[in-house]
Amino acid sequence: MENKTKEQNALGQDTAQPVVDGKKVLLRLKDVKQYFPVKKTKLREKQRYVRANDGISLDIFEGETLGLVGESGCGKSTLGRTILQLYPQSHGDILYYKDGKGIDLKKLSYEEMRVIRKDLQLIFQDPYSSLNPRMTVGQIIGEGLTSHGVFRRGDPAMKEYIFKVMEDCGLANYMFNRYPHQFSGGQRQRIGIARSLALNPKFVVCDEAGS
């Protein structure tokens, strides 16, 4: 059974955080569709679309791990990026519940979404192209910490914090000043994982992070 206060916003959406069987909903997807237009080859050709995601509705609960299984190209990565608003959905609602109230992610401004990104992180599938080759491990992990105001640049406490995150992700402290090209693919993936977890996010999309 679902229990929730019927607190409605101007759009008629429930803004109070839903609780289902005693579990708090963190993210709620309602009929989410993600269509990409196909380039026309003829002047009067009817617009066609690739339906990457077509009518997805689900709840993701606090503390829950949800796995999406499917063949290559079925839309798993697209759904993850759509939730994070890297691709705003073509249709439907994605609500993120913070401090007990729902936030419609698609309606946020760029700056508002930038604040929320601290809570919603992505571990990229490709550990090679997702790391800046000109930045050291410490700089890569610390970039989000400074841009989101967790630490000031040059703060000695930030280095100690990064060391702790690196240790948690299986990276030795002596790797702090090394560059991505000095690591194997698996080690690079650990760097990407550390970068995301350093912000202590509420939700993480792991795009085949173990591959």
Regions found by a protein language model. Name each.
Residues 27, 51-53:
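Conserved structural motif at the start of ABC-family nucleotide-binding domains
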Residues 69-70:
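The feature captures the beta-strand-to-loop junction immediately N-terminal to the Walker
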Residues 93-115, 154:
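ABC ATPase NBD Q-loop/coupling interface
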Residues 179-183, 187:
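Conserved ABC ATPase signature
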Residues 200:
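Conserved catalytic motifs of ABC-family nucleotide-binding domains
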